């Protein structure tokens, strides 16, 4: 799957790319991308932080994390998210339709956002209920202020926690209202649904993943005073409050 992703962005010579290999031996030939091979499996949070640190050190103002089971359909995707950020003031967005979470629970179903907000200059934002970390956009400013992903999380709720921290500081839309391009599916798609492509939720690793999830769930609660979901989860916001927030951050 990685080679298909790389093929879909290989002509973007104006971008800084880094590949973090946190798995088995990886052979990447024919691409002008820097590859970092972890000496041991570090997990999601630490590996993504290596990518974020590299891009910040390269003075990138707009940063994207892309997991290897995604496919770029239109390589102008980066410009589209940057344009939307500048039009809306939202400095952290994510592709919402990897897996079933924002498709009414239906794998490979149709997008089902909670709300679509239209702006001028042909920009529209979809607001989704669930936080999905397969393709994420950040401004440099947001990362320098909030910091990187909390490495106490182990392959569960790491990106959710980070996105929540960004939301608490006003760089992202509120929890349960995660922002994406309204037409993001014109630019990107999943090669396989998250349940099929995950390397941390295989049959052999399922028990380990459950243990990590429970520990990360408890750590999330100790950190924020609420859980990532459930009866004592992060409180939802009303649509009116979300719209008021969007007005306050609009440039």
Which role does the model predict for each range below?
Residues 1-11:
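Short, well-formed alpha-helical segments that are part of the catalytic scaffolds
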Residues 20-29, 71:
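A conserved acidic beta->alpha catalytic loop
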Residues 39-55:
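Glycine-rich, basic loop-to-helix element that forms the pyrophosphate-binding segment
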Residues 60-71:
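Short beta-strand-to-loop acidic/aromatic patch adjacent to the donor-nucleotide binding site
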Residues 76-92:
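Conserved donor-nucleotide/metal-binding helix-loop-beta segment in metal-dependent transferases, i.e.
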Residues 93-108:
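Short beta-strand-to-loop element that shapes/binds the nucleotide-sugar donor at the catalytic cleft/hinge
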Residues 118-138:
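A recurrent flexible, glycine/aromatic-enriched loop bordering the glycosyltransferase active site
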Residues 152-156, 160-251:
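C-terminal catalytic/acceptor-binding lobe
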